[in-house]
């Protein structure tokens, strides 16, 4: 245990918080769990806090980014996939309870991915749930600023990119006289427009020409 343990203990133990609302200050409350926010060590400690969550999964493949968790489960039979996901979601619920964390059901959703023909043949509704509480089904979702749809066509993502860059184009047309040189225009383009096209393009640049129509 030694010095590192004492150092972390002094950092985490006996932390208190108060709320100030409408000119009134609450009593001091001692924090018994969790990681302090607004600190340099906070994000690292939070990752360590969540680090063993995948150990409770039996079938799904987790992808974790801070407090966002994506589960992927693949298979040929929809009922087998449902059973595997529901079992792992129940395991996650137990893990969160044991670690004094709460799942935000308003941000919890699921999406089926496959060919258009296979998705059309899926039973409706698909029953994915946590503790008998149904999870909302979506047909496109945002993951790390990438819009993903069930057919992986990337049409929705490209549509968002087009709208953003159209806004930039009209803004530039209105204010282009403020750019005193061609280099200024180039730097603005690289920073505002091309950065959108470059972001994660290894994921979505396999889309067909029709996606840009």
What are the language-model segments listed below?
Residues 38, 42:
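Short, conserved phosphate/pyrophosphate- and ester-handling motifs at nucleotide-, phospho-/glycolipid
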Residues 1-35:
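Conserved pre-catalytic core of RNA-dependent polymerases
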Residues 58, 132-203:
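Basic, alpha-helical interaction scaffolds
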Residues 58, 69-97, 206:
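Catalytic palm subdomain of template-directed nucleic-acid polymerases
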Residues 25, 43-72, 180:
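Active-site palm subdomain of RNA-directed nucleic acid polymerases
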Residues 45-49, 85-88, 161, 168:
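Hydrophobic alpha-helical membrane-association signature
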Residues 200-212:
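Charged boundary/loop elements
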Residues 23-25, 87, 102-140:
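Short, conserved micro-motifs composed of acidic
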């Amino acid at each position: 245990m030694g010095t590192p343990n004492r150092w972390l203990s002094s950092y985490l133990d006996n932390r208190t918080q108060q709320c100030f609302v409408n000119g009134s200050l609450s009593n001091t409350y001692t924090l018994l769990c969790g990681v302090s926010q607004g600190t340099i060590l906070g994000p690292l400690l939070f990752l360590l806090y969540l680090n063993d969550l995948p150990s409770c999964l039996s079938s799904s493949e987790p992808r974790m980014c801070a407090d966002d968790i994506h589960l992927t489960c693949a298979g040929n039979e929809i009922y087998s996939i449902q059973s595997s996901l529901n079992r792992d979601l129940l395991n996650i619920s137990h893990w969160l309870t044991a670690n004094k964390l709460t799942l935000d059901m308003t941000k919890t959703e699921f999406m089926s991915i496959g060919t258009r023909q296979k998705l059309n043949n899926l039973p409706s509704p698909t029953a994915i749930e946590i503790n008998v509480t149904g999870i909302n089904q979506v047909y496109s979702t945002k993951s790390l600023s990438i819009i993903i749809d069930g057919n992986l066509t990337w049409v929705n993502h490209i549509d968002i990119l087009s709208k953003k860059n159209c806004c930039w184009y009209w803004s530039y047309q209105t204010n282009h006289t403020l750019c005193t040189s061609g280099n200024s225009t180039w730097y603005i383009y690289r920073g505002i427009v091309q950065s959108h096209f470059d972001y994660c393009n290894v994921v979505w640049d396999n889309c067909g020409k029709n996606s840009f129509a």
